[in-house]
A protein has these predicted regions:
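Bacterial N-terminal signal peptides that target proteins for export
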Residues: 1-10
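Acidic/polar, low-complexity intrinsically disordered N-terminal segments immediately downstream
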Residues: 4, 23-177, 452-457, 465-508
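C-terminal motif of bacterial Sec signal peptides marking the signal peptidase cleavage site
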Residues: 18-21
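Beta-strand initiation motifs
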Residues: 28-32, 81-82, 158-169, 219-225, ...
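Entry beta-strands of beta-propeller and related beta-repeat scaffolds
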Residues: 133-139, 200-202, 251, 343-344, ...
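Short, solvent-exposed loop/turn segments at conserved positions within beta-propeller repeat blades
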Residues: 143-147, 196-197, 206-209, 218, ...
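Acidic, serine/threonine- and glycine-rich low-complexity intrinsically disordered segments
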Residues: 209-417, 422
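Conserved blade-ending motifs and adjacent loop-strand segments that build the rim/top face
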Residues: 384-397, 429-453, 486-500
Length: 508
């Protein structure tokens, strides 16, 4: 035992001297390693596709000579950019200023590694490799002869704003041998399912073939087309998407004659959903938000007629419906700040046209939400509903209702004005937003930023038509802030008569 103890003690003493040598430890304490301080002018770097990136935004402090390593890649699936995890990382440069030309459009995680021989520091950036039409507002419009155009109001980067670069492009639709005619609706989709990515910017028309153009989301180049001619109708409005199975992802739409159709994002073909039990008056995204930081929004197709509301969440489940006997449906709104995706249905009594109520259902739709009340000393479950009476309702079935991810209120259109509605009370009696005199509201949209976006959805876009406006184009765009209904920007006389507006968010 004594021999073992002496050997162990000697080993400990030798290890202590070795550690002092390795880590510059002296009897008086540790020697401080040469630190590195990294400062950057911005946490976001923008560069155009095919243009060499020469980055001069670094300010680095180090007492010793330093080396650089730049690497980039997609953010790992299921994580946020703030977690700094890569799906796959590629080292691209050892130059202080990067000096690299990117060949792929998208938004990436960029990592800088700085080493001075004693210390290592990391700095992470958001890298946007831009195609020119990466993010902004797209407006589909038609002139008096049905000639269509796709106007794009670009969301400029700070660098582009400083340079005074062009923001409004009156028509970016350019397909060899094709003319855009009688445009009706727009939709943007981006989803990865079972390892397969489906994306596209869809343009629906009422031309002689009922053409649906499937454009590349990053460049607006034509990917493929589908024709509705053989169905005897055309796409009137898009609304909702989901995966049918592991090899199929589709966007849904209402045809002009009230049928439900599906456009396959992979095969580019159109098919009718034949189990729809009624002719559809309206269809829209049942867009919901999960509370998880990395969760995706889900945009199931919701649709309704005067009597029944329906939702389709999967091919196996089919169409689920609900109705209220003795009541007509006026309109439907979705509260998107809830993880439970509550659907609010506004009803009007068939027997008393001044009597209204709002009922609530989850995204399963098959049952109304309930609450427990004390009645005559007993606990009784009753449906959640919000009744009210009015002879002057400021809403009808033509009102377009929009929610967003940061407010429980929704916006909706009525009588050429825009109102707010809390969904749990009577709709507003006074407009929240009035457009300038002469402007006729054609469509509204929010800046929904995709299935994996943050909660920065804070804008309302309104497109209008003014037949008395001078100049070639009589269509305009007005941008309002959701929090206080304030007008933040206007772009007047930039398009023809608008049919649809949509926020074209950035897609990787």
């Amino acid at each position: 035992m004594k021999r073992t103890y002496l050997i162990s003690a000697l080993t400990f003493i030798l290890a202590a001297f070795m550690l002092q040598g390795c880590y510059k430890v002296s009897p008086h304490g540790y020697t401080e390693l040469a630190p590195i301080t990294i400062n950057a002018s911005s946490d976001t770097i923008n560069v155009n596709l095919g243009t060499e990136l020469v980055y001069n935004g670094l300010d680095i402090v180090s007492s010793k000579e330093i080396s650089f390593q730049w690497a980039y890649g997609q953010v790992k699936t299921g994580t946020t950019p703030e977690q700094h995890q890569f799906e796959k990382m590629e080292v691209i440069s050892t130059s202080r200023t990067i000096d690299y030309t990117f060949s792929k459009v998208g938004s990436f995680l960029l990592r800088l590694r700085v080493d001075n021989g004693e210390s290592i520091e990391f700095k992470y950036f958001t890298l946007n490799v831009n195609s020119g039409y990466d993010e902004g507002i797209a407006i589909l419009s038609n002139d008096e002869n049905g000639n269509g155009s796709l106007t794009f109001v670009k969301t400029l980067t700070a660098e582009e704003t400083a340079k005074g670069e062009q923001q409004v492009f009156t028509n970016i639709f350019s397909v060899d041998g094709k003319a855009l005619k009688n445009g009706t609706s727009l939709y943007i989709s981006d989803n990865t399912y079972s390892g397969i990515t489906y994306s596209g910017f869809l343009i629906a028309t009422n031309d002689e073939d009922g053409t649906i153009y499937h454009m590349d989301c990053k460049t607006f180049e034509l990917y493929m087309t589908a024709k509705m001619k053989d169905t005897g109708t055309y796409c009137a409005e898009f609304g909702g998407e989901y995966a049918e199975d592991k090899a199929s992802f589709g966007c849904f739409f209402r045809s002009a004659d009230g049928r439900l159709f599906r456009y396959d994002m992979n095969g580019g073909f159109v098919s009718e959903i034949t189990d729809a039990p009624f002719k559809i008056d309206r269809i829209f995204d049942g867009t919901t938000k999960s509370t998880a930081a990395t969760a995706k929004s889900t945009r199931y197709p919701l649709f309704y007629d005067q009597n029944t509301i329906g939702i389709r969440k999967s091919a196996s489940a089919g169409i689920r419906t609900n109705a209220e006997e003795g009541w007509d449906i006026v309109n439907v709104g979705v509260q998107r700040v809830s993880s439970n995706a509550y659907i609010h249905v506004l009803f009007r009594s068939k027997s008393d046209p001044t009597s209204y109520k709002t009922k609530v259902a989850s995204s399963s739709l098959t049952q109304w939400a309930t609450k427990t009340e004390e009645i005559d000393g007993e606990s009784v479950k009753t449906d959640v509903e919000y009744p009210f009476a009015t002879s002057n309702l400021k809403m009808d079935s033509h009102s377009k209702i929009l929610g967003n991810r940061i407010s429980s209120d929704v916006y909706y259109t009525y009588d050429n004005a825009i109102y707010r509605w809390s969904l749990t009370s009577a709709p507003g009696s006074k407009p929240a937003i009035k457009l300038p005199a002469g402007e006729q509201i054609r469509d509204i949209a929010t800046n929904f930023k995709g299935r994996k976006a943050s909660d920065g959805e804070d804008k309302l876009y309104v497109v209008t038509y003014n037949p008395s406006r001078s100049g070639e184009h009589k269509g305009s765009l007005y941008v309002y802030r959701y929090s206080d209904d304030t007008l933040t920007a206007s772009y007047e006389g930039i398009c023809d008569d608008p049919a649809c507006v949509i926020y074209k968010y950035r897609i990787n």
